[in-house]
């Protein structure tokens, strides 16, 4: 069903790498990042895959409310690079994180 837009919740957790590969391959597949900031290093690693594969535009902001909140999720995303201080690990692109937070998801999915 290539005309149907499909969103894979939680970036496909625990199969984030596979999910990144699948959303890269199929133009009608997207993923959200809901509830993932509870495991910050795992989220960092998953978003680094997103960055390396060039699929930031396929990610949607999500919170998994009521278990998490909008503000908690945004704060968690914005703090991800902070845990890398003192390391040589590559940083996530802060502009891409902000773009994901503010993305017009409904129009992207053809729902507006």
Where are these regions (language model features)?
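Catalytic cores of Mg2+-dependent Asp-rich isoprenoid enzymes
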Residues: 64
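Mid-to-C-terminal alpha-helical segments outside catalytic/metal-binding sites
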Residues: 55-60, 71-112
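Catalytic pocket-lining loop regions of alpha/beta-barrel enzymes
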Residues: 1-61
